[in-house]
Regions:
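Generic start-of-chain signal for non-secretory N-termini
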Residues: 1-29, 34, 376
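Flexible loop/turn segments at secondary-structure boundaries
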Residues: 12, 66, 76-79, 129-131, ...
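A conserved beta-strand-loop-helix scaffold within acyl/acetyltransferase catalytic domains
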Residues: 19-62, 70-80, 203, 207-310
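Acyl-donor binding region in acyl/amide transferases
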Residues: 80-164, 280-360
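Acyltransferase donor/substrate-recognition loop-hinge adjacent to the catalytic core
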Residues: 150-229
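C-terminal "cap" of GNAT-fold acetyltransferases
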Residues: 175-190, 370-390
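Active-site proximal loops enriched in glycine and acidic residues that flank catalytic Cys/His/Asp
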Residues: 258-259, 267-273, 307-313, 324, ...
Length: 390
């Protein structure tokens, strides 16, 4: 086998192709967009290069066939509560079912990370935010992945654990029918807040996205700052995100809650983009964009996915979540717009979020795992600590 560092357009193209080759013949596999994967490793487009570095490798068999790939990253902004040693990341791992091949890829990433002063590696993760390509799928292979979700053959878990990776935390997805009635606590709490004029829940207007970008930043920074792992986000960053999302955004799915006009909660959902991208084989040129626009306007997508959820800490135990979710349900439940809703992942270290999922009547749909490998095997391994709520 031959390991090749990605340093050219040709090797970058091969890096993209490895995953498609490994998953060939799997009817549930949906190829990620080529440009989105490339952007992760573009120093001009990925802001994380301000805080770290990334390397990529591909693995060829002796007869020149592509049989594996891996990327490794350092990022000074990658923080986990309870971790007091430098931790790098590995991601975009794909490999044939061969432990020796997998070990060569892991060894290469480990050696590079060690040179950079890292003492452990987490993976598979992304050189970026945790909403995309984060974790290894270990349950849920019976359905296609949602947009931004990792998807891999079942044997990958064995390749990771045989090398010495351990379960750092589980990532749970939950799903439900949009048509289902919500449990009684939701309409009851909704009625309580609806009777108080100071509390308002409303969906966004696409014509006013800049205003809602500020509300998003306010809630996100307040809701997640308590955990100490999420980076603060600016209004300008959210404006950029919203502009990117606008062509496929359904304003009826993006909700905010307010108290005396101050944003205190958000419930952000979008149509599952993979229902469109599965037709594109990784491409997003002008033809695919026209097709995407057509499909998004003609009701071809019946699946929703959760993008972000948060409540400002001092309002978290009041039932604002029920108020906001019930408002959304009242609008869409009896319409023929959507059928299935699958929520974004929640870590086992965030029991409050998992309880919200369960309270909706949703059922577990998939499980991912973020693994950790300590370079010094004599060090004690500790799982991610449970979130401390403010």
């Amino acid at each position: 086998m031959h390991l090749i560092e990605v340093t050219s357009a040709d090797t970058a193209k091969d890096f993209l192709e490895v995953q498609a080759i490994i998953n060939a013949g799997n009817p549930n596999y949906i190829r990620p967009l080529n440009n989105e994967v490339n952007d992760v490793f573009d120093t001009a487009k990925n802001k994380n290069f301000k805080y770290g570095e990334a390397k990529r490798w591909i693995l060829e068999s002796d007869n020149g066939e592509l049989v594996g790939r891996i990327a490794a990253f350092t990022n000074s902004k990658y923080i986990n509560k309870g971790t007091d040693f430098k931790t790098g990341g590995v991601g975009f791992f794909d490999c044939i079912n061969d432990q020796a091949a997998a070990n060569l890829l892991f060894d290469t990433a480990k050696a590079w990370l060690s040179q950079k002063g890292m003492e452990a590696m987490d993976g598979p993760i992304n050189f970026g935010d945790r909403d995309k390509w984060w974790g290894l799928m270990v349950e849920g292979f019976d359905k296609p992945p949602m947009y931004g979700m990792s998807y891999n053959p079942e044997y990958y878990e064995t390749l990771f654990t045989n090398y010495g990776f351990q379960n750092y935390y589980n990532q749970y997805y939950y799903a439900m029918s949009v048509k289902d009635e919500l449990p009684t606590r939701f309409p009851e709490r909704h009625a309580r807040f609806a009777a108080k004029p100071d509390y308002v829940a409303k969906h966004v207007k696409l014509s006013e996205l800049e205003k809602y970008a500020g509300d998003f930043a306010t809630v996100y920074n307040a809701a997640w700052a308590q955990h100490g792992e999420a980076k603060e986000i600016t209004k300008e960053q959210v404006i950029k995100l919203f502009k990117t999302m606008k062509p496929i955004m359904d304003e009826r799915l993006v909700w905010f809650a307010y108290y005396k006009a101050e944003p205190i909660g958000m419930f952000i959902n979008i149509p599952d983009l993979n229902q469109y991208f599965k037709h594109f084989n990784g491409k997003l040129g002008w033809f695919q964009k026209l097709r995407l626009l057509y499909m998004s306007k003609t009701g071809k997508n019946k699946q929703l996915t959760g993008l972000a959820f948060g409540i400002v800490p001092k309002y978290q135990s009041l039932g604002i979540d029920s108020f906001m979710i019930q408002e959304c349900s009242l609008l869409i439940k009896d319409k023929d717009w959507y059928d299935r809703y699958e929520m974004g992942w929640a870590g086992d270290w965030n029991p409050k979020m998992l309880n919200i999922y369960k309270s909706l009547g949703a059922q577990p749909s998939r499980r991912m795992v973020t693994f950790r490998c300590l370079f010094d095997a004599s060090k004690p391994f500790e799982r991610h600590p449970e979130m401390v709520y403010g």
